[in-house]
Amino acid sequence: VLSAADKTNVKSAFSKIGGQADEYGAETLERMFATYPQTKTYFPHFDLGKGSAQVKAHGKKVAAALVEAANAVDDIAGALSKLSDLHAQKLRVDPVNFKLLGQCFLVTVATHNPSLLTPEVHASLDKFLCAVGTVLTAKYR
């Protein structure tokens, strides 16, 4: 559960990430595919090479979902309801992959903004990303 301080940290971090969110989304996917090659199985039709237009386009979608969730941090489930339905009914992505994606996102943020990721902000973003993963897999039953 995100505390009031966590919510403030998440909103503040995403306001600073701002214009780079799409870039970070693509870099996060590239990092995940390189670090956890098993995640590539969900994208058999993609060119997964560095700088791929398909990875950039999907990274933009990932970033948009994270920004939407951050902007609606009091109602992440409501903000991501349609995406949750998609993952539950069609995509069936193994839930562990959301944790892997979250870890890669944190590394990407830390790489570009080392001073932003204080221990408190890191913990808040980690809790937020876990909450996003929980929402995206909540309807898997």
From Swiss-Prot:
Gene3D superfamilies recorded: Globins
Tissue expression pattern: Red blood cells.
Any GO BP: hydrogen peroxide catabolic process
Binding site residues for O2: H58
Entry-linked InterPro entries: Globin, Globin-like_sf, Globin/Proto, Hemoglobin_a-typ, Hemoglobin_oxygen_transport, Hemoglobin_pi
GO cellular component terms given for this protein: blood microparticle; haptoglobin-hemoglobin complex; hemoglobin complex
Keywords: Heme, Iron, Metal-binding, Oxygen transport, Transport
Pfam families per the UniProt record, alphabetical: Globin (PF00042)
Residues bound to heme b: H87
Domain Globin: 1-141
One GO molecular-function entry: oxygen carrier activity
Domain of life of the organism encoding this protein: Eukaryota
Protein purpose: Involved in oxygen transport from the lung to the various peripheral tissues.
Family assignment from sequence similarity: Belongs to the globin family.
Subunit structure: Heterotetramer of two alpha chains and two beta chains.
Protein name: Hemoglobin subunit alpha-A
Organism: Turdus merula
